[in-house]
């Protein structure tokens, strides 16, 4: 079976500063091709299938393509347009949400999409068009967690994979959206969501949420019975978050840091500090199953701002055993003529993530003058940070 480094569809590149290698998907089935959002892996556990995002400007949405490394073929599946894409690592089947509900599709071109759950009536009647930021399985893979965004609040709950029934765990009030729902990897009764923004009716726009009892309210833990616990973040700020593999703690980004919270009342623990003067040291991050290695993206100051959609970015690797860091990709340049006034309509942040049993990292690169899916080997990064 082929790999990204032996497939005819990939071209290997070397970062000119760090000398780290990565493979770019150079066969294009769409003008824009990206790695999955960092919460979910696009890989099947056997390494045969790799799903990726595709887009055709000016259309604002995405659909999926898939690489079959056994046949060395690429297939485009426009019918997967929607949101929340999640791959079952055991089978390579992809799940996603749209205005009709939750669907699944195998990687095989002769198969067709299958609906496994309709949206609840209260969502369909309200014109809800998606089923979550990124779907995640319960540990037993019998249910799928979703965050449903409705005019009357966010509904956090699970869909039964067999019956399609929806069980609501928690609902917010209108104007307080909870998104980025992620199931605990070890407990089917616990999930994490993000209070990322709030709607300001005076501005007619979404803004950062107001403090709640003096606490920045991004990090929220929700139980199946509807119990909600707010986690006070380090220095009262947090951005993108993810579960540790044992389900006993969470990680999140905080300016130039990755921070760990043990969810037991202990003070948050700083994992690493990786500042970028004038920019943002960490946007998104991810960790290996053994919590020894971390990867994160960040932004450089670009056209007078510290961040905008499509600005210059970087991907870095941190070795927690040695405390050393190396650039996997030193600089993603601006492409497609994007500017702060005319930013990308696509979420093209690198979104690095460990995949395939922590042997590879998938991310999004613009080093070839376009938006590309990129993949790197982890072992070279470990050697570079010993």
Feature map (PLM): residue ranges:
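Blade-terminus and WD-like Trp-Asp/Gly-His loop motifs, strongest in beta-propeller folds
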Residues: 40-49, 84-93, 97, 129, ...
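Loop/turn-rich, solvent-exposed surfaces of beta-rich toroidal or solenoidal domains
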Residues: 255-258, 274-333
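Surface loop/turn motifs at the tips and blade-to-blade linkers of beta-strand repeat domains
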Residues: 26-34, 76-80, 117-129, 170-175, ...
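Blade-level signature of beta-propeller repeat domains, shared across WD40, Kelch, NHL, RCC1
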Residues: 346-386
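Asp-box/WD-like beta-propeller blade repeats and closely related beta-sheet repeat scaffolds
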Residues: 78-154, 164-178
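Blade-loop segments of beta-propeller domains
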Residues: 31-40, 59-102
């Amino acid at each position: 079976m082929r790999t990204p480094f032996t497939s005819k569809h990939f071209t290997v590149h070397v970062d000119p500063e760090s000398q780290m290698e990565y493979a770019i998907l150079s066969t294009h089935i769409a003008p824009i091709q990206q790695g999955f959002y960092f919460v979910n892996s696009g890989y099947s556990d056997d390494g045969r299938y790799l799903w990726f995002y595709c887009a055709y400007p000016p259309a604002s949405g995405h659909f999926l393509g898939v690489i079959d490394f056994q046949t060395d073929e690429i297939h485009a599946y426009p019918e997967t347009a929607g949101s929340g894409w999640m791959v079952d690592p055991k089978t390579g089947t992809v799940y996603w949400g749209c205005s009709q509900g939750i669907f699944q599709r195998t990687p095989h071109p002769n198969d067709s999409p299958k609906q496994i759950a309709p949206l609840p009536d209260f969502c369909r009647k309200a014109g809800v068009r998606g089923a979550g930021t990124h779907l995640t399985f319960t540990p037993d893979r019998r249910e799928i967690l979703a965050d449903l965004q409705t005019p009357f609040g966010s509904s956090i709950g699970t869909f039964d994979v067999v019956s399609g029934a929806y069980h609501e765990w928690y609902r917010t009030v209108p104007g307080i959206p909870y998104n980025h729902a992620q199931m605990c990897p070890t407990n089917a009764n616990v999930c994490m969501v993000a209070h990322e923004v709030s709607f300001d009716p005076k501005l007619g726009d979404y803004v950062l949420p107001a403090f709640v009892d003096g606490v920045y309210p991004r990090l929220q833990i929700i139980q199946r019975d509807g119990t909600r616990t707010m986690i006070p973040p380090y220095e009262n700020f947090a951005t993108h978050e993810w579960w540790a593999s044992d389900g006993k703690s969470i990680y999140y980004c905080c300016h130039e840091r990755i921070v760990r919270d043990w969810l037991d009342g202990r003070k948050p623990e700083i994992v690493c500090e990786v500042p970028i003067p004038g920019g943002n040291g960490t946007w998104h991050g991810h960790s290996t199953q053994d919590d020894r290695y971390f990867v994160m993206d960040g932004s450089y100051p670009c056209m007078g701002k510290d961040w905008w959609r499509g600005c210059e970015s970087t991907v870095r690797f941190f070795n927690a055993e040695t405390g050393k860091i190396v650039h996997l990709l030193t600089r993603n340049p601006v492409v497609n003529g994007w500017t702060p006034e005319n930013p990308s309509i696509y979420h093209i942040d690198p979104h690095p993530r460990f995949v395939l049993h922590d042997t590879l990292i998938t991310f999004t690169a613009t080093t070839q003058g376009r938006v590309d899916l990129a993949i790197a080997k982890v072992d070279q990064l470990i050697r570079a940070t010993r």
